[in-house]
């Protein structure tokens, strides 16, 4: 129906069609995880996902140290996206897999998962984006809270780990905060980009112009446009408002989904992670288990990144590893990883 309507109004294009394919890849991965006997081992699924995050983080660290690959913003500024083209995609993917590593460590008490988390934390920070800086800090803080203050039915922290975490909070965490602030102040591009931190948050990571243009475009929609979207015409009309040389998204997933695909399709796409988030919140308050705790953090970060920086609902890379969380949530009573 979307394609037919967009063909009628002249809004159908390979670009919008590929966006739909990328999103539907999520359902393909979910179906594969749930239906294929090869993925019946939860340990195998979790380890494979975490290994991807570790390898991606090592690539970022290697590229940063030896100054190869793509710069995050420009070649002269802090940050690298290694050999990955989409900085936000790989950044959010590593953040989600870092959360998975934290969960796996507390579930199994296998120190290899903790080491994986530390590697991914370092790799994510070297991307140099606001999302990676604050996302990593949020994950580490959530880990510290879970160790020091939370009471889980299936996990209890050792006294040794609590002492290490306290030392980490007072020494390493302060060092990282000071280091990040220093990097931003000394880097000409980042210092301009994050000159007013509150303004950055209020303007949705500098996307205020993109959002304004998209809202103006959607404001002119008729009833059918609202239902089925305008496809590439949505991007073209944004381009006119922005005076850009090419069609442009708002880079805020809910707005882009509604603009290109309409509210009907967007509702079903946006609904699943939001439904799982509330389900995990309810489950956590009911049973206080470790999977619900980390799933809430992962889903909150995914949805927050979708609204703040985009590249979540529309990224096949991110969606593939979000599917791992959905897979674990749907099988929470059967999980036995090592």
Give residue ranges: language-model regions.
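Transmembrane alpha-helices of multi-pass inner-membrane enzymes
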Residues: 97-99, 140-141, 294-305, 310-338
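Hydrophobic alpha-helical membrane-interfacial segments at the cytosolic entry of transmembrane helices
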Residues: 51-59, 155-179
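Alpha-helical transmembrane segments of multi-pass inner-membrane proteins
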Residues: 46-71, 85-150
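Hydrophobic transmembrane alpha-helices and their immediate junctions
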Residues: 111-114, 260-303, 331
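Long extracytoplasmic/lumenal interhelical loops at the membrane interface
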Residues: 70-74, 78-81, 198-261
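Transmembrane signal-anchor hairpin modules in multi-pass inner-membrane enzymes, especially those
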Residues: 1-4, 44-47, 104-111, 154-157, ...
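Aromatic-anchored transmembrane helix interface
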Residues: 1-3, 7, 11-37, 50-53
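Flexible juxtamembrane loops connecting transmembrane helices in multi-pass membrane enzymes
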Residues: 159-163, 175-213, 235-240
